[in-house]
Amino acid sequence: RQMCIRDRLEAEASQVIEGIAIQKQAPITAYDRDYQVELEASYLSGQSFSYHSSKRETASYQVALLGHHQARNAALAISICDVLFEREGRELLSRELVDEALHQVVWPGRMEVVSQNPMILLDGAHNPHAVAPLIASLRELFPSQKKTILFTCIRTKALEEMLIQWQELENSRLILTTFEDPRAYSQEEIKAAAKKHQLEKVNWQEFLQNWQAEGDELLIVTGSLYFLSQVRPYLLKTEKSN
């Protein structure tokens, strides 16, 4: 039997999804209506939040992911688990087991800290919709800390819109780069974007090598999951060798 379990959505998207669910006679479990989540605190080790539903009493949980939106993602996961267990006639997982599982969550490339000194954070935000909550999380977690953003994206993404978003982040500087991939912007295209927005353009390998040796600010590497698939192993390898 099909089911529909949804997070908070724009009204139009919600209507479409719930309309399809009704057509397919799929029971609907919806954020706010059937379960609620409230962020309690954000730490460098994750998020603390309260969760309540018709199936569970209100309780606090912690998820080992940065970004305030991850509390909602964790709440959605709890709801899915509870609906599936109930459908199969199984006893719901205890609060302690759920909390233990959330403590062990790892999501490479999603506000992932890959170096502590200097602090380097990776996030695959690759469109304006994803950049907005990332910026909100950075403002919340690092309100007064100086930040450097190393950014690139692939050709199918909204480069101009994301550049404007990043330039609005306080206490930060934006640096552009590109990478070897047929989907990536060319060196010339990135140079043109850097010139238009009066930004620095760098070779990412050289930049990261220098940063690991001399960097003293928070560095966020972002813009493309394809880009991070090259950056992440590079950083982890050099971090391990150091």
Language model: regions and residue ranges:
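Short, small-residue-biased leader/transition segments that mark boundaries at the very start
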Residues: R1-I5
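Structural motif
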Residues: D7-E10, G124-A125, F151-R155, T178-E180, ...
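C-terminal helical cap/extension that packs against the catalytic core
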Residues: E10-T29, S45, M119-I120, P128, ...
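A conserved short coil-to-beta-strand element within the FAD-binding core of flavoproteins
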Residues: R33-S42
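Short, well-ordered secondary-structure micro-motifs
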Residues: A41, A132-P133, L159-L163, S186-Q187, ...
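Nucleotide phosphate-binding/pyrophosphate-handling subdomain across enzymes
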Residues: H52-R173
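Short SAM/SAH-binding signature in class I
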Residues: L76, D216-L225
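Glycine/aspartate-rich loop-and-adjacent alpha/beta segment that forms the canonical ThDP
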Residues: L225, Q230-N242
